[in-house]
């Protein structure tokens, strides 16, 4: 059997590994967080393949200049590698499922052929939302527009105007905002002590929308000084739009973005195209109708549609296009993405959905002898859906490719041809090859449920109507741990967002009524969205403790002698940073058709700061040392600084002690990003009466990590916290859940129905539940 032979791999924390990975087989790499899985798969195998490819196509050592060579002795029999990860470098809102899979291009060709005749020819790009001649001039083909939301501007209509019912005018009694409101009320004869609910429609219109451009002399207090100047009296909405005109949401105007929301374009109704373009039909439907159809419905429609204009001369071309579309749709549906539609923007997909879209694209690709790198392909998938991703992986193998996947899911691992386990722990002490097997063992479990607790207080949300959820009622125990379950697209994330928005009083129109929950002080949503997208965003900056760390360095005798203040230790301000890389430690190499690449700054060697700043030490550590050492190794340095110590301790409790404070946020996995957010929340929040909403917190964790995380959740519960978790891991659910809300086995438009809710054992025994008979399995 031919293998990829890796010798002396020592990238990051890898301990000079020597191993072989079989070609044309399916290999799973597993282990605890920070044990070296990504260092082996992405930073060694994939990075060397990419570097060798660039070097090969340029015909010289140009590739070596563009990319750093991985720390490895040699890699033999390495094939071209394709990274199908959770992150996707093209996050342009114009990138859709249709464009990424190329289905939209086939569909445009189909429209052009059918609508062309001997007298007139229709161009394919006439149906493109990127074509200025075709797209809606108001939204420029995005299908949405940003408007000021009345519900965000006035979250509570039972508050008086004087007390800040309209948030834009909220301020102290002598503030500019309050005086502006008083002037508006005086000019239009409105009682400032009225509640918004008591205002007439005309009065509310005058406060929100009037734009008479009346000049008014305003006297107000700013700090300790009293100021006077002329202002233009206008309602809150035109005032906000004036601040953010041109879509500029820079630092000076971002404060007003909280009042804005995206809604379908009022001109095109979300179709993205001009009216004249929508007059062209295919089988009685226009282009937008088809792009808005769920993929599973589109598959049935495209297979059976008829159109009288398809003549014999067109029939062959139409048949080829239809077959190509059906082939690509089938691949998407097989990966349980049938609830999506072609016009769904790529940035709005979850990491798991994006990865499955890309896998589906590869299933219809004719390339062979590739190495596919998959990053937790089971993430976001219910047990019943994982068999589909296993079949897709095996299809890639049958086509003559090699698959190397980082995964923790036992069902997926048991289907592989080879398992590589790294460990034994994360961070500097990890990176060892613990086990390699070419005959994965059968894995099973028998669930042991958490002890049943009694709850007397519940909060209830009645008649929920949002996205695919219609008329559903829920109740959640105060002080309990509630798990939301169901297959992909069934409504889990939608329900979680409803809960968050209802407690933040943002959208009263998405539910009928809410009962209970008055004692919940704060809602803390903790999702897997990236916490940063540039090298400037780091773990330490997100945790909010870098100011304190810089202040400690500025107080040292050496810094005082050099007259270095705290800003000299900032990566974002001129003075102390390396100006060659502007404090990032990296230089970005931009490619037109590949993700951006980063190489170590040749001047500072990745240390981010100039030599003067690096000569300053705090507790025998430079600022570079602090940023580059694992949290486990530096926490004792800050044991006398309560806020820093608390944040670092929370990171270690959540199994993130292997991370470095200077690690770029964009390099964190979704699971790591979520736990960093949770660590920040734990270190900043006062305990008791908070509501935590978590999105698949076990993603990226092995059994050891999960056990640690369970202890964190149970300790939070003991402090009277209420926790809501979207989750698929049935073993985790059984160990932590006091209550389950299940959406069943149907996703998309037919989903959104709560089929079971109650005690875990009750839901697991409910035949309609997605958890039915999953309390004991062998695979």
Which residue stretches match the model-derived regions?
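H-loop/switch region of ABC-family ATPase nucleotide-binding domains
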Residues: 406-408, 727-728
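Short, glycine/charged-rich "phosphate-handling" switch motifs in NTP-dependent
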Residues: 418, 739, 757
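Walker B catalytic motif
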Residues: 345, 376-377, 664, 694-697
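P-loop/Walker A nucleotide phosphate-binding surfaces of NTP-dependent enzymes
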Residues: 2-348, 355-361, 365-370, 392, ...
């Amino acid at each position: 059997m031919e293998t990829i032979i890796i010798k002396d791999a020592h990238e990051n924390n890898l301990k000079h590994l020597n191993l072989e990975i079989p070609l044309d087989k399916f290999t799973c790499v597993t282990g605890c967080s920070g044990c070296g899985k990504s260092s082996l798969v992405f930073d060694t195998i994939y990075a060397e393949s990419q570097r060798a490819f660039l070097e090969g196509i340029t015909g010289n050592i140009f590739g070596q200049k563009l990319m750093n060579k991985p720390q490895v002795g040699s890699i033999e029999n390495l094939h071209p590698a394709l990274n199908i990860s959770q992150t996707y470098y093209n996050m342009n809102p114009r990138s859709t499922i249709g464009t990424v899979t190329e289905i939209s291009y086939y569909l445009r060709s189909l429209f052009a052929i059918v609508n062309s005749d001997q007298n007139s020819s229709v161009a394919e790009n006439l149906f493109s939302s990127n074509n200025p001649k075709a797209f809606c001039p108001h939204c420029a083909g995005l299908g949405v527009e940003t408007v000021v939301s009345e519900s965000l501007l006035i979250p509570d209509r039972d508050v008086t105007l004087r007390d800040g019912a309209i948030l834009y005018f909220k301020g102290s009694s002598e503030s500019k905002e309050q005086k502006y409101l008083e002037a508006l009320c005086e000019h239009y004869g409105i009682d400032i002590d009225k509640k918004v609910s008591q205002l007439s429609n005309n009065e509310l219109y005058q406060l929100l929308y009037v734009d008479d451009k009346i000049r008014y002399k305003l006297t107000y207090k700013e700090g300790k000084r009293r100021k006077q100047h002329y202002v233009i009296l206008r309602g809150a909405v035109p005032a906000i739009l004036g601040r953010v005109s041109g879509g500029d949401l820079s630092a000076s105007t971002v404060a007003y973005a909280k009042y804005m929301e995206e809604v379908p374009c009022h001109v095109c109704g979300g179709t993205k195209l001009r009216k004249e373009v929508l007059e062209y039909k295919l089988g009685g439907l226009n282009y937008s109708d088809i792009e808005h159809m769920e993929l599973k419905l589109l598959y049935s429609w495209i297979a059976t549609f008829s159109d009288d204009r398809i003549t014999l001369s067109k029939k062959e071309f139409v048949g080829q296009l239809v077959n190509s579309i059906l082939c690509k749709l089938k691949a998407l549906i097989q990966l349980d993405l049938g609830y999506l539609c072609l016009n769904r923007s790529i940035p709005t997909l979850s990491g798991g959905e994006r990865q499955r879209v890309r896998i589906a694209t590869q299933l219809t690709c004719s390339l062979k002898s590739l190495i596919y790198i998959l990053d937790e392909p089971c993430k976001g998938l219910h047990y019943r859906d994982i068999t589909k991703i296993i079949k897709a992986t095996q299809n890639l193998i049958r086509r003559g490719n090699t698959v190397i996947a980082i995964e923790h899911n036992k069902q997926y691992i048991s289907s592989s041809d080879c398992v590589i386990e790294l460990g034994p722990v994360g961070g500097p002490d990890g990176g060892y090859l613990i086990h390699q097997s070419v005959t994965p063992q059968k894995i099973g479990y028998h669930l042991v449920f958490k002890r049943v607790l009694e709850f007397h207080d519940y909060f209830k949300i009645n008649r929920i109507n949002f996205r695919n959820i219609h008329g559903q009622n829920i109740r959640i125990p105060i002080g309990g741990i509630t798990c939301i379950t169901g297959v992909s697209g069934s409504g889990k994330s939608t329900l979680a967002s409803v809960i968050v928005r209802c407690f933040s009083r943002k959208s009263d129109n998405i539910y009928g009524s809410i009962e209970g929950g008055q004692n919940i002080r704060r809602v803390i949503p903790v999702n897997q969205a990236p916490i940063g997208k540039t090298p400037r965003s780091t773990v330490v900056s997100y945790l909010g403790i870098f100011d304190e760390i810089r202040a400690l360095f500025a107080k040292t005798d050496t810094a005082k002698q050099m007259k270095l203040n705290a800003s000299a230790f900032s990566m974002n301000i001129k003075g102390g940073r390396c100006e060659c890389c502007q404090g990032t430690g990296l230089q970005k190499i931009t490619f037109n058709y590949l993700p951006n690449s980063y190489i170590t700054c040749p001047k500072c060697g990745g240390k981010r700061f100039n030599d003067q700043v690096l000569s300053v030490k705090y507790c025998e550590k430079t600022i570079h040392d602090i940023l580059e050492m694992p949290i486990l190794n530096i926490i004792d340095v800050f044991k006398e600084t309560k806020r820093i110590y608390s944040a670092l301790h929370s990171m270690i409790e959540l199994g993130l002690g292997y991370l470095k404070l200077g690690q770029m946020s964009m390099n964190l996995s979704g699971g790591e990003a979520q736990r960093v957010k949770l660590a920040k929340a734990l270190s900043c929040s006062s305990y008791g009466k908070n509501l935590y909403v978590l999105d698949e917190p076990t993603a990226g964790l092995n059994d050891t990590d999960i056990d640690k995380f369970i202890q964190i959740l149970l300790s939070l519960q003991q402090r009277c916290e209420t926790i809501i978790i979207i989750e698929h891991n049935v073993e985790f659910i059984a160990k932590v859940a006091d209550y389950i809300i299940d959406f069943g086995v149907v996703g998309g438009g037919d989903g959104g129905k709560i089929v079971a809710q109650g005690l875990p054992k009750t839901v697991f025994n409910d035949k309609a539940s997605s958890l039915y008979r999953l309390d004991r399995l062998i695979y």
